[in-house]
Amino acid sequence: MTSVSDCFAQLRDRGQCALIPFLTAGDPDLATTASALRQLDASGADLIELGVPYSDPLADGPVIQAAATRALQRGTRLDQVLEMVTELSPEIRAPIILFTYYNPIYHRGVAEFLQQIAKAGVRGLVVPDLPLEESENLLQQAADLGIEVTLLVAPTSSKERIEKIALRSQGFIYLVSTTGVTGMRTKVENRVQDLIADLRQVTDKPIGVGFGISRTEHARQVMDWGADAAIVGSAFVNRLSEGSPSQGLSAISTFCRSLKSSLLLDA
């Protein structure tokens, strides 16, 4: 499994935009999550974001909140998620990016948490409620273990703050496409194009756009605006949760292939 940065570099050399699906670990169960990760890896996902279920997911919309609740009710905990990733990571090509809120990191201890996820094979980390001003310790310790911590840029961020985030973010920069929480929306707001342009003025790091990207035309739109990755969450979580596990796995595989096709330059 390559690093997040190396994956983006390889895609950039080929002139391709990355597809980053998101799944909630443990919904409907960890065995299905493992199968889903394999399916996504085989169906065109370039990197995969794996959410650790949390009881108070402030950045997540109703679809992902419901998935986290179901996973927690089934007893899914961080240790079990990491056991699954440990077994799975040698099998798949796409780097795994762990998405978790800061509270579980704090309670486990930054050093121990990072050592455990590095041992499991995690290559990237997104912590949506980590303030920029408090990120340095986590960023440094993670870098020492080969884990790239990606920071988020909000639509309301000032240009000065955007520049600071771009300087510190590792792997890529996560551009939030809309104010509010994650979820499926009908269109991508036009101001995302301006935000991508603002970032391009201060960094050459890859830019991934997420929150509200739920259709093939959304993914194509952000690529045409200059993004290096389309991050798709609720639409995958929703498809996996509908019907039986086998039906959900088939649905996300088909959707993943469709999204990846839309991101190819000759689509």
From Swiss-Prot:
Stored PROSITE patterns: TRP_SYNTHASE_ALPHA
Catalysed conversion reaction: (1S,2R)-1-C-(indol-3-yl)glycerol 3-phosphate + L-serine = D-glyceraldehyde 3-phosphate + L-tryptophan + H2O
Enzyme Commission numbers on file: 4.2.1.20
A GO molecular-function annotation: tryptophan synthase activity
Keywords: Amino-acid biosynthesis, Aromatic amino acid biosynthesis, Lyase, Tryptophan biosynthesis
Assigned GO CC terms: cytosol
Pathway: Amino-acid biosynthesis; L-tryptophan biosynthesis; L-tryptophan from chorismate: step 5/5
UniProt-annotated catalytic positions: E49, D60
Pfam families: Trp_syntA (PF00290)
Assembly and binders: Tetramer of two alpha and two beta chains.
Family from the record: Belongs to the TrpA family.
Function: The alpha subunit is responsible for the aldol cleavage of indoleglycerol phosphate to indole and glyceraldehyde 3-phosphate.
Protein name as catalogued: Tryptophan synthase alpha chain
